[in-house]
Amino acid sequence: NSVHPCCDPVKCEPREGEHCISGPCCRNCKFLNAGTICKRAMLDGLNDYCTGISTDCPRNRYKGKED
């Protein structure tokens, strides 16, 4: 059983000094910089971007509401 390099196996959270374990805006245990594309545009022509403070890839605020 291998342990993820970002994960403290006892606490089941990021190791000390690391930001994250996984997610679209996490790479090498750190949050991706704000403005990094995390989801490329499809039909609407607007990319989604990382915030620099979360592993989530928030929906571009200029896109319409999801159906």
From Swiss-Prot:
The keyword Mitochondrion does not apply. SMART domains: DISIN. Residues 1-65 form the Disintegrin domain. A motif (Cell attachment site) lies at residues 42-44. Negative results: does not inhibit alpha-V/beta-3 (ITGAV/ITGB3) integrin. The disintegrin belongs to the dimeric disintegrin subfamily. Inhibits adhesion of cells expressing alpha-4/beta-1 (ITGA4/ITGB1) and alpha-4/beta-7 (ITGA4/ITGB7) integrins to the natural ligands vascular cell adhesion molecule 1 (VCAM-1) and mucosal addressin cell adhesion molecule 1 (MADCAM-1). It is also a weaker inhibitor of alpha-5/beta-1 (ITGA5/ITGB1) and alpha-2b/beta-3 (ITGA2B/ITGB3) integrins. The inhibitory activity of EC3 towards alpha-4 integrins is associated with the MLD sequence of EC3B subunit. The ability of EC3 to inhibit ITGA5/ITGB1 resides in both subunits A and B. Belongs to the venom metalloproteinase (M12B) family. P-II subfamily. P-IIe sub-subfamily. This is Disintegrin EC3B. It comes from Echis carinatus. The lineage of its organism: Eukaryota, Metazoa, Chordata, Craniata, Vertebrata.
